[in-house]
Curated annotation (Swiss-Prot):
Entry similarity comment: Belongs to the ATPase delta chain family.
Binding partners and assembly: F-type ATPases have 2 components, CF(1) - the catalytic core - and CF(0) - the membrane proton channel. CF(1) has five subunits: alpha(3), beta(3), gamma(1), delta(1), epsilon(1). CF(0) has three main subunits: a, b and c.
Keyword vocabulary terms for this entry: ATP synthesis, Hydrogen ion transport, Ion transport, Membrane, Mitochondrion, Mitochondrion inner membrane, Transit peptide, Transport
Protein name, per record: ATP synthase subunit O, mitochondrial
Amino acid sequence: MAMTGRARSMGFSILQKALSSAQRSNAHRSILCPTLSNSELLRNYATASASKEQKIKVPLTMYGVSGNYASALYLAAVKSNTLEKVESELYDLVEASKKSPTFSQFMRDPSVPVDTRVNAIKEICAQAKFGDTTQNFLLILAENGRLKHIDRIVKRFKELTMAHRGEVKATVTTVIPLPADEEKELKATLQEMVGQGKSVQIEQKIDPTILGGLVVEFGQKVFDMSIRTRARQMERFLREPLNF
């Protein structure tokens, strides 16, 4: 059977209230998160819990806006020993945004005032009982207009947490869900490739356009064994001129 994600949901009935509530004062906002450059915010956030701790490094090198924020969050979560909790909370948040058009639009609407965004995030975090690490991170995103990047940031963060646990993701695309025995066999084959010390995690995707067979994306490699690709290869072969 296809691997399905967890279906946890959260209530966001307070969102409308937050959006219509009075804006906070500038003084309040400056206390919550003083005006700093993005690099300063990320640096301060990532090192806030590091007094005299040993230096922690991210397991993967990340680039771009989403990569920088994901790396900063990873460092903060590891130092506060809340990595799994933060990962779970962000998963819940992203899933909730997928199920709520209003919340999703709020996250991506640049016209929403900063104060309104921050108030909404604070109330959402309180209702969902998110921990301090997650809440502080979301407030930074809200302050800097980066909530629209939350999906990409969480995806990059997931890559870091998997690397932290020694997990390697293999994406398997098929027309119908892969039977359990075939998934187990495929996982065993991939596990032999990565060797000991790492664990293969299979993510299944359904794509009827490949017509049949399967496509396996594993690390930097792609094994395309789909009927669609085979048909295209056969078509190219048949179009080639015959030389006798």
